[in-house]
């Protein structure tokens, strides 16, 4: 049996402020730091060990992973960072307060932007200061790879490129893997692993800082999955 652990980053400063974050590189809140430490301690308490780790290129996920591995005395294992594990890009909504956006556009429209698989928020322009192409960390991406906005299907597409190209190979080689990523990238991966129909994804939620364990067969098909909490 193969075990895979998924962790959504601890609460970020913009989670706390109820803002759309996307590719904006905000840090963890104080509570988020506590969530990351707690996740590391829970994993260690339950006997988990990892050979390799994956995360995005956004500091809230990277820092969460660092803290988890530190708490587990595993700071030395290889860590691979990929933009393909970044949060879904929220386009022109990035930085906006979710409640205020709902008042402006209506709760139904915002719900569709956030939760429907094939609905995209309004695009950024390349002249916008929030455009990822302005950031050094994305200098090696071509223009087609840098989103102006995304829906969940777009996010799933790039997440699965990372899954098939690297993560799945490590798992099949017997490596024990942890992924520290984001709400929508993990929703996309869970949708794929559990073969969830697009119509049922709207209510799928991944909480911050709580390890989600998948037990997989040799073909990487889920046998079961469960969250690790303080009570276990």
Curated annotation (Swiss-Prot):
Quote the record's binding site residues for substrate: 8-15, 21-22, 60, 87-90, 98, 114-115, 183-184
Return the PROSITE patterns for the record.
PG_MUTASE (PS00175)
Q: Which Pfam families match?
A: His_Phos_1
SUPFAM superfamilies reported for this sequence: Phosphoglycerate mutase-like
Provide this UniProt record's keywords sorted from A to Z.
Gluconeogenesis, Glycolysis, Isomerase
Asked if the keyword GTP-binding belongs to this entry, the reply reads no
Q: Does the keyword Isomerase apply?
A: yes
Q: In which pathway does it act?
A: Carbohydrate degradation; glycolysis; pyruvate from D-glyceraldehyde 3-phosphate: step 3/5
Q: Which GO terms describe its biological process?
A: gluconeogenesis; glycolytic process
The EC number of this protein is 5.4.2.11
Site entry: Transition state stabilizer: 182
Which enzyme class?
isomerase
This protein's superkingdom? Bacteria
- Reaction(s) catalyzed by this protein? (2R)-2-phosphoglycerate = (2R)-3-phosphoglycerate
Which residues catalyse the reaction? 9 (tele-phosphohistidine intermediate), 87 (proton donor/acceptor)
User: Care to name a GO molecular-function term for this sequence?
Assistant: phosphoglycerate mutase activity
Q: Which purpose does this protein serve, as stated in its record? A: Catalyzes the interconversion of 2-phosphoglycerate and 3-phosphoglycerate.
**NCBIfam families for this protein:** pgm_1, PRK14115.1
* Annotated family: Belongs to the phosphoglycerate mutase family. BPG-dependent PGAM subfamily.
- What protein name does the entry list? 2,3-bisphosphoglycerate-dependent phosphoglycerate mutase
Q: Which organism is it from?
A: Clostridium beijerinckii (strain ATCC 51743 / NCIMB 8052)
């Amino acid at each position: 049996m193969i075990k895979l652990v998924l962790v959504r980053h601890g609460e970020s400063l913009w989670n706390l402020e109820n803002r759309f974050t996307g590719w904006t590189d905000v840090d963890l809140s104080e509570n988020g730091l506590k969530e990351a430490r707690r996740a590391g301690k829970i994993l260690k308490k339950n006997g988990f060990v990892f050979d390799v780790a994956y995360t995005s290129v956004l500091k809230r996920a990277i820092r969460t992973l660092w803290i988890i591995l530190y708490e587990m005395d595993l700071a030395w294992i290889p860590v691979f960072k990929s933009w393909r594990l970044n949060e879904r890009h929220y386009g022109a909504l990035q930085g906006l307060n979710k409640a205020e956006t709902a008042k402006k556009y209506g709760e139904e429209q915002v719900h569709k932007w956030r939760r429907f698989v094939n609905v995209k928020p309004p695009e950024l322009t390349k002249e916008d200061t929030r455009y990822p192409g302005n950031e050094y960390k994305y200098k090696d991406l071509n223009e087609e790879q840098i989103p102006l906005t995304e829906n969940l299907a777009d996010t799933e597409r790039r997440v699965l490129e990372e899954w098939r190209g690297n993560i799945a190979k490590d798992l099949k080689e017997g490596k024990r893997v942890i992924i520290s990523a984001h709400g929508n990238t993990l929703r996309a991966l869970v949708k794929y692993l559990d073969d969830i129909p697009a119509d049922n994804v709207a209510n799928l939620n991944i909480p911050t800082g709580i390890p989600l364990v998948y037990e997989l067969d040799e073909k990487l098909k889920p046998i079961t999955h469960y969250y690790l909490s303080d009570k276990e």
